[in-house]
From Swiss-Prot:
This is tRNA(Met) cytidine acetate ligase. HAMAP family: TmcAL. InterPro entries: Rossmann-like_a/b/a_fold (IPR014729), tRNA(Met)_cyd_acetate_ligase (IPR008513). The gene is tmcAL. Its EC number is 6.3.4.-. ATP binds at residues 6-19, 100, 157, 182. It comes from the Bacteria. Belongs to the TmcAL family. Keywords: ATP-binding, Cytoplasm, Ligase, Nucleotide-binding, RNA-binding, tRNA processing, tRNA-binding. Catalyzes the formation of N(4)-acetylcytidine (ac(4)C) at the wobble position of elongator tRNA(Met), using acetate and ATP as substrates. First activates an acetate ion to form acetyladenylate (Ac-AMP) and then transfers the acetyl group to tRNA to form ac(4)C34. One of its GO terms (molecular function) is ATP binding. GO terms for cellular component: cytoplasm. Its main location: cytoplasm. It catalyses: cytidine(34) in elongator tRNA(Met) + acetate + ATP = N(4)-acetylcytidine(34) in elongator tRNA(Met) + AMP + diphosphate.
Amino acid sequence: MAIGIIAEYNPFHNGHIYMINYIKNKFPNEEIIVFMSGKYTQRGEIAVASFETRKKYVLEAGVSKVYELPFETSTQAAHIFAQGAIKMLYEYNVDKLIFGSETNDIDLFYKIANTLKNNEQEYNLKLKEFLKQGLGFPNASSLALKSLVGYEIVMPNDILGLEYVKAIVNNNYNIQAYCLKRTINFHSEFTLENFASASYLRTLIYKSEDISKYSPMIFETIPDRIENYYEEFKQKVISTSKEELAKISLISEGLENRFKKIVLEAQDYDSFVNKANSKRYTSSRIKRIMLYILLDIKK
C-alpha cells in the first residue's frame, strides 16, 4: 500500500524533505504519494512556483508519485480542504496519512474526532450558538470543540490535522493517520539550523533573497503574486452589479455590499483585506473570495 502526504509545498523546503526521509525510515517498503495544491493555495494566493516545478523537486526528494488536488479542494477552508483531500487519498487506495503537527498527539486527534462523531447534534448546536454571536467559522468551531471535549485546537497544522482525522473517522475510510512534530512554528520568522517556515521563505523569495540554506528550490525571478491583480479585482467589483457579485462562491450575508464599499477606499490588496476582515470573516476567507471574483467562480 502507500503513505499519503497532503501539501502545498509553497515553497518546498528542508522541513518537507525531513518528513519524506522520516517516512522512508519508518515505512521503508511503502510508496510515498503526495497530493499537492496547484497554482492557487488554500488562502487564495498564487503559489511561488507552478505545480510542475514543485512536483519536480518533490520527486527528486524521493517520493513515488505527485498528484494535483483539484481547485475546488485546494482553495477552501480547512474542513472542506481536508474532506476533499482525504477522499482523494481513499480513491487512490492510500491507506496511511502523515502530517505535520504542533501538538504531535495522534491519539488526541482520534479521541476528538470520535467524540464529535458520536455527539454531532450537540456539537452543531454549540457551533450555531457561537456563530450567532458573530464569530467566524474557525473561532466558533474551536470554541464549540472546547465546550464539548475540553480541548481547544488553535495551531494551524493541528487544526488541519484534526480535520484530516475527522474526515477519515466520519467516512469510515481505511486510512491510518500519523503525525510528525513540527520543528518551526507556522508563521515563525525564526530559523532553526537549516529549517525555516514556508511563510518566512516566501517573504525572502519576494525580496529576491537567497533561500538555498533552507530549500533546494531556485528562483531566478520574483514569482507572480495575487497582490499584482488588485487593480483588476477592483475594476471587477466596481463594474459588477451587487446581484451578480452575490452569485460568487463564498459570498453571503451581504458581503457583496461590504466589498462594493471597501473597494472604493482601499488602495491595494493588503489594505482591502485588512478593511474587509472582521471577527466573523477571516482574512483567509476574504482572500479566497477575492480570488473567486478574479476567476469568476460562481456558487
